[in-house]
Amino acid sequence: MGKYIVKRVLQFIPVFLGVTLILFALQNIVPGDPIKLIGGDKALSPEVELQLRVRYHLVQTDEDGNAILDENGDPVQTSLVDRYLYYMNGLLHGDLGNSYQRKLPVTDIFAQKYPYTVKLAACAIVLEAIMGIGAGIISAVKRYSFWDILVTLTTSILVAVPAFWLGMLLQLFFGVILKDATGGAISMPISGAGGSSSQYQDWMHYVLPTITLASVSTAYAARIMRSQLLDVMNQDYIRTAKAKGLSNRAIIVKHALKNALIPVVTYIGVDFGGMLSGAILTETVFNWPGIGNEVYRAISMRDWPIVMGGVTLIVVVVMVINLLVDISYAFLDPRIRLGGPSDKA
């Protein structure tokens, strides 16, 4: 197991470097000067603009920290490689840089935003696990019944409907239609993350974003669960258990479910990292004060330190979760050995 973990960590390094390097290269392709956008409607003076470029390491400087000028008096731009190495050096020291627009360290901004994103993703994962696994089991056990047809139809609709559009439909129904129909007696928060003195009211703000974020993933989890459970139920050892007179409940709970859960757990585990990145649209629709919404705004304003910090954080989380999911294989199924025949899980 130890050798396997070390091997996977070493495999993560080129992936991480590749993703961050590609994103750095894209910054040069996307039109628009982020420094000129700092002033908003007011144009920055050449002196202030040059100071900002020096501060954000966008131009080369001498030993005294002054910008190096070329023959025409223009500042010499810092190369992509130099900026990348400068960013990676800061990253090793826990520094994600400073936001162009907000003038604050990116780590401080994310420290405020990250709890909201993690809690939203955690709620969505719990909903996905409960509803997806439960619906998949019911659909497989009640094959070709009304419940199977209902689950199949519902999952097909959820897969086809874009999550952000579902979010807007939920806002329309609970925030307008249902509220007007009941004279305001029944309503649901459709924006923000609360902040009131009532914990109940704060948690109510999580309901619609959680449903939106978990909708597509829950549908896929239910499909995988149904397919895997039906496949396991056709295995020889299940037929042997039936021949011994075990009840269907005992067969499913003690024998079939554990093996059928492995691909589902894999999907749900990996999906947590996907939710952290996929939460960008959901957080934007519901004006959620999380990292996704912050990154979305940063993209529109060319605030690259926040974009880089958000992507870096997501990549690290996804890689760690993938490793934890792989390790969990050995605990779900003792037949699986991650480190080879000589490495006991």
Regions found by a protein language model. Give the residues of each.
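Alpha-helical transmembrane segments of integral membrane proteins
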Residues: 2-3, 114-147, 163, 193-345
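N-terminal signal-anchor/signal peptide hydrophobic helix marking the start
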Residues: 6-16
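Hydrophobic alpha-helical segments of integral membrane proteins
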Residues: 9, 48, 80-96, 106, ...
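Hydrophobic alpha-helical transmembrane segments of membrane transport/permease proteins
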Residues: 16-81, 178-202
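Transmembrane helix irregularities
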Residues: 30, 158-161, 276
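An internal, D/E-rich "acidic patch" concept
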Residues: 62-133
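Membrane-water interface segments at transmembrane-helix boundaries in multipass membrane proteins
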Residues: 152-218
